[in-house]
């Protein structure tokens, strides 16, 4: 009976980690053809009025400039110019296809991430008992650690999250989240988030040390500040 009680929270933890990923992946595979068909049939008309990607606009401009340049060169025959127009038309169709695939990718990934969030929210509401057991295990593990190990872990965690080299890690992490949701890479937004998140986390962490750790474990705070200095 005790083994069963101990096994249940572990099974719950494994399901939290793997089940949302498996369900979202299955949903993405099963809905890909439907979303593709819906986008191509319902959204094909307004596409040319909704081109937002800078790279695609630059490609269109390059194609137009190439066409004008070739038309200005009189040595080329009409057949060559006709082939050039056909090639530009094919390139345009390819750009439209790439754009549509990007939008479909965005819809699918955004939907699957919403599903993962709903599943995790449901787990947190329905599995309150298992969460309490897992929380007690974590607290017991942390309680058995020495203050030196705790201070070292806090110092390592803060250096990783808000240290001197943390912006590069934040840039990779935010870029991964952007890609996972299917959004187009935007350097300005990512730079703004990278410059904002560490400051917010640093403020929250200092407040947590001041309000909680000073009251619960003053010796840990002393060791942490000694290591940090």
Swiss-Prot record:
- Kindly give the InterPro entries that the UniProt entry links to this protein: CemA (IPR004282)
* Annotated PANTHER family: CHLOROPLAST ENVELOPE MEMBRANE PROTEIN (PTHR33650:SF2), CHLOROPLAST ENVELOPE MEMBRANE PROTEIN-RELATED (PTHR33650)
Is Plastid given among the entry's keywords?
Answer: yes
Compartment annotation:
Plastid, Chloroplast inner membrane
Pfam families, per the entry: CemA (PF03040)
- Which Gene Ontology molecular-function terms are recorded? antiporter activity; proton transmembrane transporter activity
Query: Species lineage, top-down?
Result: Eukaryota, Viridiplantae, Streptophyta, Embryophyta, Tracheophyta
Q: What protein am I looking at?
A: Potassium/proton antiporter CemA
């Amino acid at each position: 009976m005790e083994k069963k009680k101990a096994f249940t929270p572990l099974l719950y933890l494994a399901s939290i980690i793997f089940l949302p990923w498996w369900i979202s992946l299955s949903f993405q595979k099963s809905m890909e053809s439907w979303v593709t068909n819906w986008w191509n049939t319902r959204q094909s008309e307004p596409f040319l009025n909704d081109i937002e990607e800078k790279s695609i606009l630059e490609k269109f401009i390059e194609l137009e400039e190439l066409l004008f340049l070739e038309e200005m060169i009189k040595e080329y025959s009409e057949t060559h110019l006709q082939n050039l127009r056909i090639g530009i038309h094919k390139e345009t169709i390819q750009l439209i296809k790439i754009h549509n695939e990007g939008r479909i990718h965005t819809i699918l990934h955004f939907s699957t991430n919403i599903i993962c969030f709903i599943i995790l929210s449901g787990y947190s509401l329905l599995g309150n008992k298992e969460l309490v057991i897992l929380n007690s295990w974590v607290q017991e593990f942390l309680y058995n650690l020495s203050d030196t190990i705790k201070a070292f872990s806090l110092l390592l965690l803060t250096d990783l999250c808000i240290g001197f080299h943390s912006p590069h890690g934040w840039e990779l992490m935010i870029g991964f989240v952007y890609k996972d949701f299917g959004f187009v890479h935007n350097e300005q937004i990512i730079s703004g988030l990278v410059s904002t998140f560490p400051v917010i986390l640093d403020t929250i962490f200092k407040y947590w040390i001041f309000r909680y750790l000073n009251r619960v474990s003053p010796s840990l705070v002393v060791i942490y500040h000694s290591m940090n200095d």
